[in-house]
Amino acid sequence: MKRVTQKRAIQSVIIFASFTIGIPALAESISDPPPVLEPSDPNGKRVLFDNSHGQTAGQSDWVIDGAFSDFADALVENGYYVKEHRSAEPLTSADLDGYDVFIIPEAQIPFKAIEQEAIASFAEEGGGVFFIADHYNADRNFNRLDSNEIMNGWRRGAYDDITKGMSNEEKEALEGVVSSDWLAEEFGVRFRYNAIDHTVADTIVSPEEAFGITENISALSIHAGSTLAIIDPNVAKGVAYLPDGLTPEANKWNNAVDQGVYHGGGMEEGPYAAIGKKGLGKAAFIGDSSPVEDATPKYRNEEHGGTKRTYDGFIDQDNGVFFVQVVDWLAEQESYTNFAEAGIPLDEPSPLLEMELPEKTTEPQAEPWRQPQGDYRWYDRSTFAAGSFGSGQEAPLEVEYDLETPEALPLGGQTFSVTVELRHLEPNQTVNSLDMQVYLPGGRSISQIQGEDGSWPSSYGYHQIGTLTADATGTATKTVTMRLNPSVEADSAMIRLRNDRQNVVTQTVALTAASEKVTKHPTIQKSLKRKSVPVAIAGS
C-alpha cells in the first residue's frame, strides 16, 4: 500500500496549496526571555533586532528565530552577537545601550515620540540603525498604519492627526505618538508611499562611492516594495535603484491604491536602498522586507491563528551578502558627520509629487483595507490567536491526514480500497465534511466512491466518504471502496482528499491495467527542520 501523511489545522481560516506542511508554533508572551544568538568567533559587535512594534503581525514573522533567522544566522557567522528586543514598555536609550546596530524590521505599531528620540540619539552618539520598510498599505494589523508611515512619522491623509478615525481604545494605545516628518528631519530621507513590483533593483552604486557596501552586488530583489526620497543629500545617499522605464501598467503592485509608480523608476523614483549619516552614527534603509525574509516562520497569525507562509528572499539575488555588508558598515564608527566630509559624490534631492508632501497627502481609500476577523484587536494581546507571538497560548495540534492507497490503482473498473485516517482530533469528535476523487492531469475526474448501502454514484468526481468518529486518542479511520472509469487509459493520476472543500492531501498515484499484488509501505513521515536557538536566561 502507498501511504502519505499530511498535517492541517482543521480550524485554520487559510489553508495553503497541497503538501504545505503545518509549522509547529511555539507561543511566547512579551514577558518571556528573548532569543539570543552568540557567535563561536565573536567580533565584539552586538546587534539588536526590534520585536516590540508589531513585527509578527499578520503574515510577517520578522524575528531572529523565525523568518529573519537566515539574516540573524549570517550575522552570527560573521561574529556578531544577536539578540531580540521585546518589551511592553516604550523603547529607551537604556534598551539600546551596549549595542552597535539596531535593526527595525517593518514596524506595525507606531513609535512614541520618546522612542523616536531614543533612536535618533542612539545614532547621533555613534550607533547604526537599519530601517526595513515595505510598500504603502502593508497594514498587517489593521491599525491604519503601515511601516513606511510609521518610520516616516506621519500617516498619509492624516498628517495633522495620526489617530484620525480611530476608536478611543486605539487612541489610548497610541498615547505619546506624535505626527511629524521625523525621518526626513532626523535622517534626511523619506519612505515613499509607492508600491512597485515585477522588477529588480539592478542599478547599483559603485563600492567606491558606497563605502564598500555594494562590493560584489549586482542586483537586489523586490516583491511589492517602495523606494525612498532623498531629502538632504548631505546625510542621505542611495546605493541601489530600480530600472528606468517602469510603468503603472507593468510595475505597480496588484493591490496598489494609487498609480504605484511615481516617477517612472530609475534615479527619479528614488533609491530602493539607501544609507545615511547622523552625527557619529549611521543609518540604512530599504523599501521592502521580502529580500530579508526566509521560509521558516515561527509563529501563527495573530489575527486568526493560521499558519504563516514566508519566502526565501534572503538567498535570492545578492540580498544576503548585501545585508551583511550593510551591517558591517553600520557597526563601524567613523568620525565624518556628513557625506561631503567623506569625499563621495552627493545625490541630488529626489523630485516629489505634490501629493507626496506630508501636509498635502490624502487617503486614497478608506482604512483599514479590511476589518479584522472575530474579536482580534491589534492593541489587545488577549485577543491574539493561540500560537501567535504575544498570546502566550500554544497553538492546537494540527490535524494529521493519512491516506493509504494501493501502490497502483487498477484500471478497467476494478474496485480498490483507500483508507483515510485523521489524527489529533478531539476525543469522540465527528468529521463528515471529507470528500475525495482521482483525476487526470488537466482535471478530468475519473473516480467513484461506493456508498455505504453498496450503491455507486451516477457520475465521476468528488464524493463524500461518510462520517468519521475519533476514538479516545483522537484518531479516526475509515476505509472506502473506489473504482475508476473503465474507459480511462493512462499511466498515472492524482488522488485528492478535501475537508470542507479545502485541499488537504494531493498525491500522485500510478495506474495499472492488470490486477497486481500490492504491499503495504510504512507511513511517509515529513519532518520539519527546527532551528536550535539559544535563549537568554533573563532579559529581542
Q: Where would I find each of the regions flagged by the language model?
A:
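Solvent-exposed loop/turn segments at secondary-structure junctions
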Residues: 53-56, 88-91, 103-111, 129, ...
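Catalytic beta-strand/loop cores that center a nucleophilic Ser/Cys/Thr
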Residues: 181, 188-294, 410, 414, ...
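Mature catalytic domains of secreted/periplasmic carbohydrate-active enzymes
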Residues: 27-50, 65, 94-97, 174, ...
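A short, well-structured beta->alpha microelement
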Residues: 75-92
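Sec-dependent N-terminal signal peptides of Gram-positive bacterial secreted proteins and lipoproteins
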Residues: 3-27, 539-540
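A glycine-rich, often tryptophan-bearing local segment used as a flexible ligand/cofactor-contacting loop or short
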Residues: 110-210
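Glycine- and acidic-residue-enriched helix-capping/strand-helix junction motifs
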Residues: 55-68
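Extracellular ligand-binding/catalytic regions of CAZymes and related secreted enzymes
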Residues: 28-45, 258-539
